[in-house]
Regions:
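Enriched for short, Lys/Arg-rich terminal
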Residues: 66-94
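Basic, Lys/Arg-enriched alpha-helical interface segments
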Residues: 1-60
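Short acidic-hydrophobic surface loop/beta-edge motif
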Residues: 62-64
């Protein structure tokens, strides 16, 4: 089974998204994050589910789309994935 690790940057991104959504509704923010984690957990069985990030064209750097967010991750090995960013799709990815 594949282990999924969250980088500090991805964790900070997720916290910012949660904080933003929770200004309107803590309940919706909780649900959003729970559903996001469920989406990420699908990578344990299907690590190549996401598309290659077009800006970088590296086979190991991929993304899942969740709502308006790009969940950018890197396949480190057959047993390890790192979540790199939780990035709003309207913003440029650097």
């Amino acid at each position: 089974m594949i282990s999924i690790f969250w980088t500090q940057l991805a964790s900070e991104d997720l916290q910012e998204v949660y904080d933003y959504i929770s200004r309107d509704s803590i309940q919706y923010a909780d649900r959003f994050v729970d559903n996001l984690f469920e989406r990420v957990d699908t990578l344990e069985k299907f690590p190549r589910l996401g598309r290659v990030v077009p800006e970088f064209a590296s086979e190991s750097l991929r993304e899942l789309i969740y709502g308006n967010y790009r969940l950018v991750y890197e396949i480190i090995s057959e047993t390890e994935i790192h979540m790199i960013r939780v990035h709003h799709s309207a913003r440029l990815l650097k």
